[in-house]
Amino acid sequence: TGEREALAHGRLLVLVNDGSLRNLIPAELAKGFGFLQSKPASGFSPVAVTPDELGAEWRDGKVHRPLVTHLNGALFGRPDAGVDMTFSFGQLVAHLAKTRDLCAGTIVGSGTVSNRENGGPGRPASEGGVGYSCIAEQRTVETILAGRPSTPFMRFGDRVRIEMTDELGRSIFGAIDQRVRGPA
């Protein structure tokens, strides 16, 4: 399947928050089961849209709009989803289809939305940059630049809100709004 043909099979676009429970990952990997207990259920936006609904913001198999993330009410990031996206959805789907059949309902994620700055890592939104969509990425950049991370991982009670709006500020997909809860 070529990239153009693969892209034509994509029917709906949706936002996804694929979180990780970072403190559980090492022990889970040691058990040999992979990320089983360290990957909670993903959060999905309440609305899926067809690519044509995005108009000019959908081009080259990418969504060209800022993905806005707030952490505990403060802006954490607003990187443009189409800028610095390594592979288009056409490329991703074509690559996946090389070794498997992709049936109706298959969800293909593009990975973390991130933008570079001047050829290097981005800057936090709190420092005037576009920020990040992933706490682990911000912590990695902090470690590279300062020798250690300063941004904590989310804790019980913390809240994340992820949304993409159109040029008039209207929500395109609705918001993913999640709070970290303790064990049931």
Please provide the spans of the model-predicted regions.
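A generic structural motif
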Residues: 70-72, 163-167
